[in-house]
Amino acid sequence: MSETKTEKATFGAGCFWQVEEAYRDTPGVIETAVGYEGGHVENPSYEQVCSGNTGHAEVTQVTFDPEQVSYEELVEKFWAVHDPTQLNRQGPDVGDQYRTVIFTHSDEQAEIARRSLENARQRFRDPIVTTVEPATGFWKAEEYHQCYLQKRQEQGGLLGMLMGR
């Protein structure tokens, strides 16, 4: 029996809880993890990243089977799950850790992401501020952040969380 060949995709699109939830049940996605990428501090804590002094973005790293879901499809979902025209914010979350960014793991991914960015520019009225950058090091966030919204479903999901349940 042959082992499944997997690839990684890393997306910053605001709060990593919502981004992870958007990808978690996608067919072909094997695993998701939330963490930090793009900064200058090794293994930063959530508090450090939120201070705005580390340069990291909150990201979701997706491990996927390219025979079941293509990188192109994952990038298309990226455009659908957030507003790529908002600079350093998504909704009420403000700060450069919430920036819109695609971190690529290969030259092929970089080419696909850039081409997708050009196509997306034709679909949005306002200028897109998303950057495409090479992945330089993913730091997994604290365990309580992993599958955060899924863990809260027993307590009424996101609505329950917002209502203090």
Indicate residue ranges for each PLM-predicted region.
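Flexible coil/turn and secondary-structure edge motifs
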Residues: M1-R165
